[in-house]
Amino acid sequence: MHVQEAFKINKPLVLEEFGLPRDSVKFTSNTSTVQRDRYYRAVFDIVEKHAAEKGVFQGCNFWAWGGFAEPQHLFWQRGDDYMGDPGQEEQGLNSVYATDSTINMIKEAVSDINQIIQKQ
């Protein structure tokens, strides 16, 4: 519905807050991200296709940046690292850590989308 409405009024959309837990729904930074990387790649492909065809999706914002944080408890407690996941959610649930393979994919997608938009 949002896509059709944005198309009707000629306004861009940003696909935001998409994310997926790490493989086996584990939260530590050493857990693999194969399934999440596939999901992110599919999302980036859609946004890149729309950008190239001057479609409505012109950007995206993943959820959530975990950086160098490391979950210390299942749910946030005073003194724990701040992560992208809110305190009422499992810490590390959707966090993209600075050491994840997902980072390179994000960098490539950002570069590709920027190049497409700059050529228009």
For each feature predicted by the language model, list its residue ranges.
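Glycoside hydrolase catalytic-domain groove-lining segments
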Residues: 1-26
